[in-house]
Amino acid sequence: MSVMDALFLLATEEVGHFGINTNLLETNVINLAILIGVLVYFGRGVLGKTLGDRQKQIATAIAEAEERQKVAAARLAEAQQKLTQAKQEAQRIREDALTRAKAVKEEIIAQAKREIERLQETASQDTSAATERAIAEIRERIAAMALAEAENQLKARLSQNPDLQRTLIDRSIALLGGK
C-alpha cells in the first residue's frame, strides 16, 4: 500500500463512505500528514536538486577560497622573499658605503699628510731662500761698507800725502798703457 492509499483511507469515514471530517484536531493532523506526504513525494526531487546545487555552490566557493588562499600565500612568500632580498641589498649598500667611506677617509688623510709635507717643504725652501737672500744682502752691505771705508781711508791717506797720490796716478796710467 502506498502513501497515497494510506492518506486516502484516512480521509474516509468509518462506515466506508467518503466524506468530510469536521473534527478540527483530526483534520489538522490529517492535513499535515497529507501535506508532508505530498511534499516528500513531489518535493524530494526539487529539494534534492536545490540541496545538490547549494552543495555545488558551497564546494565551488570553498575551492575558490582555497585557490585565493594559495595565491595569497604565494604572493606573501614572494613578498617576503623580495623583502629579504631588499634587506640583503640594503645591507650590501651599507657595507659598500662604509668601505667607500673608509677608503675616502684614508685618501683624504693621506692627501692631507702629503699637503702638510709639501707645505713644510715649501716653508723650508722659503726659509732657506729667505736665509740665502738675507745672507747675500748682508754680504752686499758688508762689501759696500768695506768699499766705503776703504775709499774713506784712501782719501784720507791721499789727502795727507800728495806724493802718494802722484805715484798712484802714475801707476794707474802705466797699467792702462801709458808711459
UniProtKB/Swiss-Prot annotation:
Membrane topology recorded in Swiss-Prot or TrEMBL: Single-pass membrane protein
GO cellular component terms attached to this protein's record: plasma membrane-derived thylakoid membrane; proton-transporting ATP synthase complex
Predominant subcellular localization, coarse grouping: membrane
InterPro entries per the UniProt record, alphabetical: ATP_synth_B-like_membr_sf, ATP_synth_b/b'su_bac/chlpt, ATP_synth_F0_bsu_bac
The entry's keywords: ATP synthesis, CF(0), Hydrogen ion transport, Ion transport, Membrane, Thylakoid, Transmembrane, Transmembrane helix, Transport
Name of one Pfam family that matches: ATP-synt_B
Molecular function GO labels: proton-transporting ATP synthase activity, rotational mechanism
Compartment(s) of residence: Cellular thylakoid membrane
Assigned protein family: Belongs to the ATPase B chain family.
Chain's role: F(1)F(0) ATP synthase produces ATP from ADP in the presence of a proton or sodium gradient. F-type ATPases consist of two structural domains, F(1) containing the extramembraneous catalytic core and F(0) containing the membrane proton channel, linked together by a central stalk and a peripheral stalk. During catalysis, ATP synthesis in the catalytic domain of F(1) is coupled via a rotary mechanism of the central stalk subunits to proton translocation.
NCBIfam families in the cross-refs: ATP_synt_b, PRK07352.1
Name recorded for this polypeptide: ATP synthase subunit b
